[in-house]
Amino acid sequence: MPSQAVFLVLTTVFSQCVGKFPIYTIPDKLGPWSPIDIHHLSCPNNLVVEDDGCTTLSGFTYMELKVGYITTIKVDGFTCTGIVTEAETYTNFVGYVTTTFKRKHFRPGPSACRDAYNWKAAGDPRYEESLHNPYPDSHWLRTVTTTKESLLIISPSVVDMDAYDKSLLSKIFPNGKCPGVSIASPFCSTNHDYTIWMPENTKTGMSCDIFTTSKGKRATKDGKLCGFVDERGLYKSLKGSCKLKLCGVSGLRLMDGSWVSIQNHEEAKWCPPDQLVNVHDFHSDEIEHLIVEELVKKREECLDALESIMTTKSISFRRLSHLRKLVPGFGKAYTIINKTLMEADAHYKSIREWSEIIPSKGCLVAGGRCYHHHNGVFFNGIILSPDGHVLIPEMQSALLQQHIELLESSVIPLMHPLADPSTVFKGDDGAEDFVEVHLPDVQKQISGIDLGLPEWKRYFLIGVAALTLFALTIFVVVCCRRVRRRERAKPNPVELIRKVSVTSQSGKVIPSWESYKVEAEGQSQA
C-alpha cells in the first residue's frame, strides 16, 4: 500500500533522540565540496533508504503489526469468589427452632472456578443450586451447624493487556498489575485473598491478535543482515534498532518506531524503557493521504525546480532546498560558493528540535560543529538573514508539524516491562498455594445437648445443679442412716418370745405368759 510506505519512509531512521520523532534532516557527515555542472543535479529518491553494499536479497517471512491495530487490548474474564454459608439451628425444650445464617470466605481453586463458570455460561441449574443456602436440620436440645461452600462467578470482568510484556492491568489486581496467565498459573490474584480472576477463553483469550504475516526480502552484505525490503517494497535499515518483545514475541523496534519479528540481528541490544513502538490505526490513514499528497507535491516541486534550472541555465538558493534528501541516509548536498555550483557527499541524520541544529544565533550545526557559511550561504537552501538569523525554508511547514503530532499520538501508551522491573514476573507463581476446591456436598455437624442459654447463665445453672445434687446426696445419705438405725434397734420376734417375763402379784417372776396364766388359775382355785 503506497500510503503505508510513504508514512513509514517519512519516519525512517532518525537521530539519537531517544523516544523522539524526526522533524528535519541535516548532514552529520559532509564531504569536500567539488564543482559540478547543472546537468549533474538530480532529485533524491526519498522512497528508498539503502545501506551501502547490502545488495544480496533473499525471500523470508516476518510478522508486523496489523493496520488498524488499536492500542488498548481488552481481555474478557471473570472473577471467582469462594463463599462458605453456615446455617446454625437450635431447638429448645418446647421444640422452638431458631436458625442463624452466617457467611465466610475461602480461597477458591482455578479448576473449580472454571467448572462453575462453565455451568453459569451453559445455564446449568447446578450453578444456581450451589448458591442456595444450606437446608437446616434440627435436633431437640441440640445445636446443628450445616455448612455449604459455593463459588460466586461475576462476568464479564474486562481488563487491559500490556502489549509489551503481556501483563494484565486493572484496579482489581495488587498494585494494578498481574504478570499474566499461563498453563502453570491460569489465574490472577486480586486484592482479596478469596477472589481470583481468570480469562473466559483459555485458548484465545490471552492471544494477541495484533500481528500479521508479511513476505519480504532480506538484505545482507557478506552474510550479515543489515536491512530488509518489506512487503510494500520499502527498504528498512536495521541500524539503530533494538530488541523488544510484543505480546511475548521477540522482534526488533526499528528507529522509525515500527516493529518486525526479526530476531537474528546480533548487534541489537534491548530497548530502554522509553522506546515504544508506533501503531497504525484507521485515523492515521486519513492523514497519510495528506502526507502522500505532500510528498508527491515535493517531488513535483523538485522536478519543476530541476526543469527550471535546466531551461534557464540559472540556479537559486530556494531551488536548491528542493534537492535535499528528506529521509536519513546517504545522499547529496548542494550549495553555491563564489557563484559556482558545488556538490558534496553527505550522510543525513534526523533531528527532533530546531535547537539541535540552531543552538544560537547565526550557528548552523552540521557535522558536529557550527558550519562556516560562504557569504551568508550554507547549503540546501539554508541562508543567513541580514540580521544574522539562520533561515530554513522547511521551518514554515505546518503540515510537517501535524505529521509529527500524529506520530506522537500513535505511540502505544502502555507500560513497558523495563520501566518497573519489580512489577514484572516474580520467582514464584501462586498457583501451588491454592487448593483444588470442587463444590462439596453440604456438611452437617450436631453438637451435644444445648439449652440455648448464655454463657453466664449456663455456668450458673451448672452450679445450681451441682448444689442441688450435693444436697440431694446429703439427704439420701441421712435418710439411709436413719433407716439403718431403726433396723438395728428393732429385736428379733423369736428372741422376743423367749425373753418375755411377767412379774406376778406375789412378786415372783414368771418366765412366760403361759406360766403366768397357769399360776393365776391355781391361785384362783385355792
From Swiss-Prot:
Membrane topology (Virion surface): 20-459
PTM section of the record: Glycosylated and palmitoylated by host. Glycosylation is crucial for glycoprotein export at the cell surface.
InterPro entries: PH_Rhabdo_glycop, Rhabdo_glycop_CD, Rhabdo_glycop_FD
Keyword set includes Kinase: no
Main subcellular location of this protein, as a coarse class: virion
Topological category with respect to the lipid bilayer: Single-pass type I membrane protein
GO CC entries: membrane; viral envelope; virion membrane
Industrial or biotech use: Primary surface antigen capable of inducing and reacting with virus-neutralizing antibodies. Almost all human and veterinary vaccines are based on the functional aspects of the G protein.
Signal peptide interval: 1-19
Transmembrane stretches, start-end: 460-480
Lipid-conjugated positions (S-palmitoyl cysteine): 480
Compartments, record wording: Virion membrane
Family matches, as Pfam families: PH_Rhabdo_glycop, Rhabdo_glycop_CD, Rhabdo_glycop_FD
Glycosylated residue positions: 338
Subunit structure: Homotrimer. Interacts with matrix protein.
Family according to the record: Belongs to the lyssavirus glycoprotein family.
Name the record gives this protein: Glycoprotein
Gene: G
